Amino acid sequence: MEYTPKHQVTIENRPLWVFDDLCTQVEAEGIFKGLQVSAFKKDEIARPDTQEYRHWAVNLSAEQIRTLPVYHRAIEAIRNLTNQEYTAYRGYINHASYGDMLFTHTDCAPDANEFTVLVYIAPEWNIEWGGETLFYNSDDDCIFACTPKPARVAIFHGAIKHVGRPPNRICFTPRYTLAFKLEKVTQ
């Protein structure tokens, strides 16, 4: 199937695509419901120099990743856009609430050929709640802000500096993102 990006941006020759057709609302709501009983741990860090500011996450097994239809659709979309095969080497779900401190970071080395997939899985999101993912160039200018609409998927080169902003004070729902870290399949 052909998936069409709603937004397509290049930041310093690295791609970023945003899709509204890779994850269904029903799928996102199902994942969200499962999170209510998940064992989140506050052990995730953005960068080594920010390790005193940990945030909540729950890791997924390779088997759990493979059972998610959105994972397979994301892999297919990347294959269609890049003509290359990728696979997940890590999957997890981030949890952020008002007052959490989240830091800018990259997900891979500048010369690595890796992608990150972010799936926004809150069943509803109000624009006033904040929670956008911001993407930066090497001058620390924000080039693109991805609104965390329910079931939205952002796929981007892992070397793009980015940050997920925590929700604003009026938001009482956690900002959940399902993340897949992808590496190129070697033959």
Model-derived segments and their meaning:
Residues 1-84:
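Non-heme Fe(II)/2-oxoglutarate
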